[in-house]
């Protein structure tokens, strides 16, 4: 995956073109897939994108008779062989990323491929048109400011349970805490924001959380309801907060833990937002603004 300083654009599997395959859809917050969908491909994947690279994440093939490689063609260049990671063993992982490409419009065709696709990540370039896109911000991004002493970073794979392929969270890490008073803040220029994490269905107790968006508070509680039949010990892509539609412009989201009991945790994986700027040159540098304000206050 690209570096944390890059701007990543999320491309979910329904936004891709396949020559042959099928798509599974699950109810919200019940499975492991971004957007609650994934696609199993037996043929070609064709993508046109504007940026400097693209990567694909999903399950590699379970079948021992399926090819352990595929052909990757980029623009007018000759296709080349790519081997799946962990060939012979089914894993949920980033199974392909293009080399870094010149900023611009690119065509990628992955052929003779049998694989599962959950999502793709495009690294935006200066010429990438961002209107209508979804920016994804990893939990390790410097744009997220963590407060409190209880935060811990984890890079362990998520255990999804029988019938599912375990795998890493987006960006391979999460931030977790159960300390009252811990929180984070994030500033963005956009028209909608969502917060996603990992939920532990085998944990006990509760974590109560306040999300404050531009001064308006939304309270929620993370807990496992009584008599719940646990299907997944943990799940990825659990929606922790959604703003709904906002006026396009600059916004501030603050999260704060107000109560915690038992061993339940707040686990942050990533944020997504719809930008209100059209190109990277128009993206505000809130990190620099916060740093300048801090120096002025000293």
Roles of regions detected by a PLM:
Residues 1-296:
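Glycan-recognition surfaces in beta-rich domains, encompassing non-catalytic CBMs
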